[in-house]
């Protein structure tokens, strides 16, 4: 007998903001495939009664928040955590880092069929705020606003304005998810959707052949060479007000490397000592020990994490008299040799790889075409597909999660679950895609050494208003891998990585403000970029007060309390 496909719902809670009275004052749910089926109510008990009987897949946007209320309720109503799918238990996927992916509530079995409702996080499929989804996806409804701090006692009657706000919220996510599902994007995360899309194009059989599963031991060694984006502030400009400058960023930096660069495939061969050129295995990861000093006039490129001798986020000018232990892709190693003088070098061992170009060509061509010929939702989905794939290759095989429990004070606590691993995807690919991305940004920045202020993954920030020679022939607002002229600023101030302000030249075109130049600007936009700073705090920033030590007690911090989660005002300080 064929079972009916499971229904899917977009859900949302509105909650009180007091530590001593933490509860859900309103809920909403809407059928993702039939927006006329929805309900908005004011009782968590009523919502959970529906959850236990609906046997559907539910989506909350930021399950880490709303899920805490659900697990509080389950724990207080006879449900216990279990990984074994027993009746009247629930299971979770919560990562070691506290990322929530799923709550699976099991009611029992009908024959062999599990009777359960599964709750997912739509934020993992659509990693944007609801307001941005509505705007970028050009949906029929836009996100509204309500007073979150208003007194709402138990049994509070929802006002028409609040009702409309909740309905809008669940409908925005319902519409966006439906578009994804219609495109066949039905996995738990954007990365999984992207990987599935890639496998569909090259076939699972070819994928397994080209990207074999490496042993956990081999994967661990490869992973030592895996690094993120290049984010660096030139000391020369740190904490100073700077005059005019320009920002350029690479169009789709990671897909551009995937499209054209030499990338690894197949089983690696382990070698001892120093890599010797092998045309069949032209890429390699080298394990070396050495001391190093930055050459005069060069940008530092080496970070050493997990070491007691060095700050993990600092690009080093010197090894400081210590022997540094490094695993580097040949791309990173060549860059290091160009930028540093190396001393007492010991080549220990390494891994070499077969390599080719074009593995991702069909996938990137498909989604780039969709991106450039579509508007709204489909355009955003194409961007998501293009940008979510590379990270999936380097997924950590250690998937040991956290298990929730109710503490004595009635709030949720979390303990580390049993150690759990999964097969790695193909980490060498992640290593080389990110290495080529750093190479792209660093070589462009180095060629503008006398002008470079700051680099952030795919962008370079320069003094002056002339396009530098190194990129002048590859500037285009849309072409894959070209540099787009992002903005020109009148003045700026940079304090540290991901912490800077700019007065940006703007001009009016067809009633809209767009980036301008010193010659044609009609307005100035004050832009604040600061990791961890909320929009509310950004409104307090000026050129005068933007410095190390700037502090405001206005940053909402989630705190687990009896009943669920409350956002309490915490202090944000630029350190």
UniProtKB/Swiss-Prot annotation:
Site, Essential for 3'-5' exonucleolysis: residue positions: 12, 14, 66
Outcome of mutating residue 529 to E: Increased exonuclease activity and complete loss of primer elongation
Listed result of changing residue 364 to Q: Partial loss of hability to stably bind the DNA substrate
Effect noted on mutating residue 529 to A: Increased exonuclease activity and loss of primer elongation. Deficient in nucleotide incorporation
Region (Initiation, polymerization and pyrophosphorolytic activities): 230-562
Impact noted for substituting residue 122 to T: Loss of capacity to interact with a DNA primer/template structure
Variant or mutagenesis effect after changing residue 69 to Y: 2 fold decrease in replication activity. About 80% loss of TP-DNA initiation, 50% loss of TP-DNA replication and almost 95% loss of TP-DNA. Complete loss of interaction with TP amplification
Gene Ontology biological-process entries: DNA replication; viral DNA genome replication
Effect seen on changing residue 14 to A: Strong loss of 3'-5' exonucleolysis
Region described as 3'-5' exonuclease and strand displacement activities: 1-191
Site (Involved in binding template-primer structures): 93
Keywords: DNA replication, DNA-binding, DNA-directed DNA polymerase, Early protein, Exonuclease, Hydrolase, Magnesium, Metal-binding, Nuclease, Nucleotide-binding, Nucleotidyltransferase, Transferase, Viral DNA replication
SUPFAM superfamilies, sorted: DNA/RNA polymerases, Ribonuclease H-like
Molecular function terms, GO-annotated: DNA binding; DNA-directed DNA polymerase activity; exonuclease activity; metal ion binding; nucleoside binding; nucleotide binding
Outcome, altering residue 384 to R: Reduced nucleotide insertion fidelity during DNA-primed polymerization and protein-primed initiation. No effect on the affinity for the different dNTPs
Site residues (Involved in proofreading function by stabilization of the frayed primer-terminus at the 3'-5' exonuclease active site), renumbered to this chain: 15, 62
Region annotation Involved in DNA-binding, coordination between DNA synthesis and degradation and TP interaction: where it falls in the sequence: 192-229
Site feature location: Binds ssDNA: 65, 122-123, 356, 420
Known outcome of mutating residue 454 to F: No effect on the formation of the covalent complex between the TP and 5'-dAMP. Loss of replication of a p3-DNA complex or a primed M13 DNA. Increased 3'-5' exonucleolysis
Site (Probably involved in positioning the templating nucleotide at the polymerization active site and in controlling nucleotide insertion fidelity): 384
Site (Probably involved in binding template-primer structures): 252, 387, 391, 434, 438, 498, 500
Binding site for 5-methyl-UTP: 254, 371, 383, 458
Effect caused by changing residue 388 to G: No effect on initiation and polymerization activities. Increased efficiency of dNTP incorporation in non-templated reactions
Catalytic activity reported: DNA(n) + a 2'-deoxyribonucleoside 5'-triphosphate = DNA(n+1) + diphosphate
Family membership: Belongs to the DNA polymerase type-B family.
Name of the protein this chain belongs to: DNA polymerase
Highest classification ranks of the organism: Viruses, Duplodnaviria, Heunggongvirae, Uroviricota, Caudoviricetes
């Amino acid at each position: 007998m064929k079972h009916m496909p499971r229904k899917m719902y977009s859900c949302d809670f509105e909650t009180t903001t007091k530590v001593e009275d933490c509860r859900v004052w309103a809920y909403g749910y809407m059928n993702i495939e039939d927006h006329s089926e929805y309900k908005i109510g004011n009782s968590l008990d009523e919502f959970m009664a529906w959850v236990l009987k609906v046997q559907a897949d539910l989506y909350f946007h930021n399950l880490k928040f709303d899920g805490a209320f659900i697990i509080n309720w389950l724990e207080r109503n006879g449900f216990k955590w279990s990984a074994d799918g027993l009746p009247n238990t629930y299971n979770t996927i919560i990562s070691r880092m506290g990322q929530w992916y799923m709550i699976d509530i099991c009611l029992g079995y009908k024959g062999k069929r599990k009777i359960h409702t599964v709750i997912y996080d739509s934020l993992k499929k659509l990693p944007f705020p609801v307001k941005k989804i509505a705007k970028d996806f050009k949906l029929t409804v836009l996100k509204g606003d309500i007073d979150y701090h208003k007194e709402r006692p138990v049994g509070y009657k929802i006002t028409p304005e609040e009702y409309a706000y909740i309905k809008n919220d669940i409908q925005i996510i319902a519409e966006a998810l439906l578009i994804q599902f219609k495109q066949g994007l039905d996995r738990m995360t954007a990365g999984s959707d992207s990987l599935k899309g890639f496998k569909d194009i090259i076939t699972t059989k070819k994928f397994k052949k080209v990207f074999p599963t490496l042993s956990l031991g081999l994967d661990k060694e490869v992973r030592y060479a895996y690094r993120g984006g290049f984010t660096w502030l030139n000391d020369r400009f740190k904490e100073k007000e700077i005059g005019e400058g320009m920002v350029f960023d690479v169009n789709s930096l990671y897909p551009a490397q995937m499209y054209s660069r030499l990338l690894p495939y197949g089983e690696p061969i382990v070698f001892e000592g120093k890599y010797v050129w092998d045309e069949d295995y032209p890429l390699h990861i080298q394990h070396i020990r050495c001391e190093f000093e930055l050459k005069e006039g060069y940008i530092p490129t080496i970070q050493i994490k997990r070491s007691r001798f060095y700050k993990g986020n600092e690009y080093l000018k010197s090894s400081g008299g210590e022997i540094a232990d490094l695993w580097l892709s040949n791309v990173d190693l060549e860059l290091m040799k160009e930028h540093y003088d190396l001393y007492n070098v010991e080549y220990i061992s390494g891994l070499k790889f077969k390599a080719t170009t074009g593995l991702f060509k069909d996938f990137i061509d498909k989604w780039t075409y969709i991106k450039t010929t579509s508007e709204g939702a489909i355009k955003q989905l194409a961007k998501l597909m293009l940008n979510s794939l590379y990270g999936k290759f380097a997924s950590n095989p250690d998937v040991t999660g956290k298990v929730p429990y109710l503490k004595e004070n009635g709030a949720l606590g979390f303990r580390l679950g049993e150690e759990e691993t999964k097969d790695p995807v193909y980490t060498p690919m992640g290593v080389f895609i990110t290495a080529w991305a750093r190479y792209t940004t660093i070589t462009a920045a180095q060629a503008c050494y006398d002008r470079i202020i700051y680099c952030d993954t795919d962008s370079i920030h320069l003094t002056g208003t002339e396009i530098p020679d190194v990129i002048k022939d590859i500037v285009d607002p849309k072409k894959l891998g070209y540099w787009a002229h992002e903005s020109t600023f009148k003045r700026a101030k940079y304090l540290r990585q991901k912490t800077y302000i700019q007065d940006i030249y703007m001009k009016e075109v067809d009633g809209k403000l767009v980036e301008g130049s010193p010659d044609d600007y009609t307005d100035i936009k004050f832009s604040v970029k600061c990791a961890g700073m909320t929009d509310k705090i950004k409104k307090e920033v000026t050129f005068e007060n933007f410095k190390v030590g700037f502090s405001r007690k206005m940053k909402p911090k989630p705190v687990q309390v009896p009943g669920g989660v409350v956002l309490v005002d915490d202090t944000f300080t630029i350190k």
